[in-house]
Amino acid sequence: MIYKKIKSLTNYFIKTLGIIFLLIILIFFFGSSTSLRINFLSEYALDNLKKFVRLKPDYNSFQVNNISEFSEVYKEWFLSFFNSKNDFPKVEILTNFNNLIKLENQRSRKVDDSFVKARIKIYQQDNNDNKIIKVKVRSKGDRNIHRINHKLMSLKVDVRGEDRFFGLEEFSIQDPIVRNYTWEILLHKLAKKENLIGLEIFPINLIKNGEKIGIFFVEEGFTNELLEKNNRKEGPIIGLDENASMLNFPNLYYDFYSEKKLLNKMPGTYKIAKNKLYELKNNYKNNNFNINDYFNIDDWAKLFALTDLLTTYHGTVPKSVKFYYNVNTGLFEPIIFDGHKGGDNYQKFIFLDLVNSVNTNNQECGFVCQHKEWFNIFFDKKNVNFLNKYLFYLEKFSSENYIKEINSIIIKDLNHINKSLYANLAPSDGVFYKGFLPYHFDLNHLTERAKLINNKIH
């Protein structure tokens, strides 16, 4: 017991020294004037120093960037020693030893990611009548950050039987950093606000076989429940076959979710949707091609305008965005997925630049320009109706009133999550690694994006 207390106090002392050291650095780099910093370091040297300590460039900065933000984060960390913990659901994944070995082999990519049986316990607040759900789980994620170790690995979960996990049949459990924390939650809340199909994403306190892991996020899968909650009729949901070698349009292969069920229940609809995808890939360059015959252009215009505001461009590339085939309209609607704000340099870019042929090199538009064939289907000057809708939503989403509405959502739904993340000194998202400084959510990024959009459309 004495050893544990000494160890705890030592760790606290080391962290405190680290805080003081970082405060000194931040005061110099972010609190002092630019001219003062240049007297000591050239901008080139300063940029290299930022890279060395894994600070992302300013356009991508979702870590603490000034004394005020630093104080906000470390205040929550300090108060966490005295305040009660968060009220997120407590969830435990229970797996036997043999299946733990299988999951570990999946994590290290020694075997295919096949499902193994497990159970999930949902703890009740009074510790009575805890709910046990039978599930099957497997590892998931392309980037190594999904597979750092067994404790932090991302999991795909399917419920076995008729039970549901907070209303979900299929979902993922993953470290919040893999989607840049609450930015992804905000994206989906705004999507649903605009009557687009958005996923449920919420925090839990995760335990694995008795070991407390920490705050993880649950992300909804692609099922009929998703469609019902978003007021859509049952219909095909389509992604990409990521096992194929090509993921660039049109050299890609589409993959239907729950394909066997779909073939048994809606064979005619399945065939129509599949044929339409084939026509899209083969006819998109024809002079008589019309996007109105394939896409709900109002929904896609909303998606692209919202993406410009949030810089969640990763969610619009073919690998990420999912299609829902609406059986009533015969058109494809977007399902937002994996927006992952902060994945590349979009400091000056919006989709409108594709029409005007500006900022279309990889230094300005990141991996968007690696998928020009896909985006040019929409951002072609002949698509007058689509472009008018897109400009309308750009105007709406970049307005002062809309930014105020977003701020209300942040205060109501995200602030308490962010405070819990600050209390744990959650590291900033470096996309492929954990950042040097703690994560911080900054609304100013959206106000700056709104200014950029307004300057481009007026």
Regions found by a protein language model. Give the residues of each.
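Regulatory N- and C-terminal appendages and interdomain linkers associated
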Residues: 2-132, 402-458
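Middle-to-C-terminal accessory/interaction subdomains
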Residues: 34, 99, 271, 275-312, ...
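Conserved oxyanion/phosphate-binding beta-strand-loop segments in alpha/beta enzyme cores
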Residues: 116-172, 177
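Anionic ligand-binding catalytic core segments
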Residues: 138-152, 163-168, 254, 349-376
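Surface-exposed patches in mature extracellular/periplasmic domains of secreted proteins
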Residues: 170, 198-207, 290-294, 321, ...
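A conserved helix-loop-beta module that forms one wall/lid of the active-site cleft
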Residues: 176-209
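Internal "kinase-insert"/substrate-recognition segments embedded within catalytic cores
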Residues: 195-199, 211-302
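Short beta-strand micro-motifs enriched in acidic
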Residues: 324-328
